[in-house]
Amino acid sequence: MPIDCKAKCGNRASLKRPKTGDALCKDCFFAAFEAEIHHTITTSKLFRRGEKVAVAASGGKDSTVLAHVLKLLNERHNYGLDLVLLSIDEGITGYRDDSLETVKQNRDDYQMPLKILSYEELYGWTMDRIVAQIGRSNNCTFCGVFRRQALDRGAKLLGVDSIATGHNADDIAETVLMNILRGDTARLRRCTDIRTGGGEDSIPRVKPLKYSYEKEIVMYAHYKKLVYFSTECVFAPNAYRGHARAFLKDLEKVRPSVIMDIIYSGEQLRFKDTVKKPVRGNCERCGFVSSQQPCKACVLLEGLNRGLPKLGIGKKSKGDRMIAKQNQELALRERANLVKNDF
C-alpha cells in the first residue's frame, strides 16, 4: 500500500531514511539531507566567507557527494567559498587510475579546478611498488601516512585555507571503535573532532559529512544520478578497519542508532590530566606537521629507500634497532674491505 511522504508535501513516499526511519519522497529526502549538512557547516563554523577550500576528491561516493553538495550549498546560501578539487594518485593499478577518470568527470560536472598529486612525484614510490616490497600486511599504514601528508602538500601548493574531507558518520564511528580496541588514547581524543589541525604551520581539515550516514550518502548519489567510482581498493580487504566495519554493521542490526551513539560517546570522552598528549611540531626533515621526530612519513620513506620496509612499523625502538643493526653490518663490510685492500 502506498505511503504518504511524512513531510506532508502531498507526494507518495519513495524511500525510508536509514537515519530517522522517516518515509519520504525523493525531493523531501534531498532537502532534508542537504539541510542537515548546511546545519553542520553553519553551527560548527567550518568555513568563513572568502576562503579557498580544497575538496579531497577520490572519485568515490563520499567525495563526489561532498563536492556536489558543497557546490550546491555554496551557491544556495552564498557561503562565498572558492572550491577546488585535490586528488592523490597513490599508484594502484586497476583502482586509482580508473577512479581518477571519475574525478576528472567531477571536475567537468561541477566546474571546479582540479589538482592531482602522485606518490611517485612526491616520494618516488607507488603503492604497487611498496606492496611488492612489503607484502599486504602493513600496506594501509604506508598508504594512510603518505596520503595524509600528500593532502597537506597539495593544500599548501594550492594555497587553500582548509581541506574538506568526505568522512561520514560510519567512518567516524569505525575510527572510535578502532582506537578503543587499540588503546590509542591520543587518536581517540581527536577522532570525533569535526575540525582537526590548523595553527600556524598546518592547514585545518573539516568533515561536513560527519553526521551523514553512509547509506544515505549512497541513496543521495543514486537518486541524484551522480557519477562516482564504487570499486573497493584492491589492497583494502586486509585492512584492520574492515573488522571494525563488520562489527559496527552487526551492532547496527540490533541497535539502529549505534552509529550516532558511538559518535556522541566519543565527543563526550574526557581524559585524565595524567594522560600524555602528543606534542605537535614540524618534522626536522620535511617541515610538515608531526607529533614525532622525524615524522612517520619520513621514517617509512627512509625504510623503503634503505631496503628496510618495516622500519616505521611498530614501536620506534624496534626501528632504531634495525637501523643500528644495518649500520653495524655496513661498518663490518667496510672494515673487511679495508683489511682486504691492505693485503
Curated annotation (Swiss-Prot):
- What protein is this chain from? Cytoplasmic tRNA 2-thiolation protein 1
Q: Where in the cell is it found?
A: Cytoplasm
Broad EC category: transferase
Q: Which GO terms describe its biological process?
A: protein urmylation; tRNA thio-modification; tRNA wobble position uridine thiolation; tRNA wobble uridine modification
**Protein origin, superkingdom:** Eukaryota
Record keywords: tRNA-binding included?
Answer: yes
The job of this chain, per UniProt, is described as:
Plays a central role in 2-thiolation of mcm(5)S(2)U at tRNA wobble positions of tRNA(Lys), tRNA(Glu) and tRNA(Gln). Directly binds tRNAs and probably acts by catalyzing adenylation of tRNAs, an intermediate required for 2-thiolation. It is unclear whether it acts as a sulfurtransferase that transfers sulfur from thiocarboxylated URM1 onto the uridine of tRNAs at wobble position.
Known EC number? 2.7.7.-
Q: What organism does this protein naturally occur in?
A: Drosophila mojavensis (Fruit fly)
The protein's matches in NCBIfam families, at most eight in alphabetical order, are given as: TIGR00269 family protein
